[in-house]
């Protein structure tokens, strides 16, 4: 289980992406699909988080789902290339209404699916 805080300025996510995926990184692992189970904490409900995630994920050919929880968090499972998942995180962090304070992340087994959906 990995947890990392984020800042509104997106500096932290930018730093994580740059450390894990420097410009010279072009290994085979970049092309392998991974699946991540993520729990987002912060101002993540009532701000278009799920629909932004769906739009971005579909535009990046990622699969999975996103769902609001009763405790005010948003849970998402997303599958695809790890670099694209981090691009999704950067896109979510750029939204002016979404305030991600913390993300709990766990890697899961990949699944066979063909789209990204909002669960209710």
Which residues fall in each region the model found?
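Intrinsically disordered, low-complexity, mixed-charge
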Residues: 12-120
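Short, small-residue-biased leader/transition segments that mark boundaries at the very start
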Residues: 2-9
């Amino acid at each position: 289980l990995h947890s990392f805080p984020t800042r509104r300025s997106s500096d932290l996510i930018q730093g994580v992406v740059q450390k894990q995926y420097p410009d010279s990184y072009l290994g085979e692992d970049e092309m392998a699909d991974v699946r991540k189970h993520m729990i987002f904490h912060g101002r993540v409900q009532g701000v278009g988080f799920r629909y932004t995630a769906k739009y971005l994920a579909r535009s990046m050919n990622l699969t999975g789902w996103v769902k609001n929880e009763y405790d005010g968090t948003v849970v998402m499972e997303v599958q695809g290339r790890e670099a694209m998942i981090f691009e999704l995180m950067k896109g979510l962090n750029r939204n002016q209404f979404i305030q991600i304070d913390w993300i709990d992340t766990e890697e899961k087994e990949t699944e066979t699916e063909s789209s990204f959906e909002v669960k209710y």
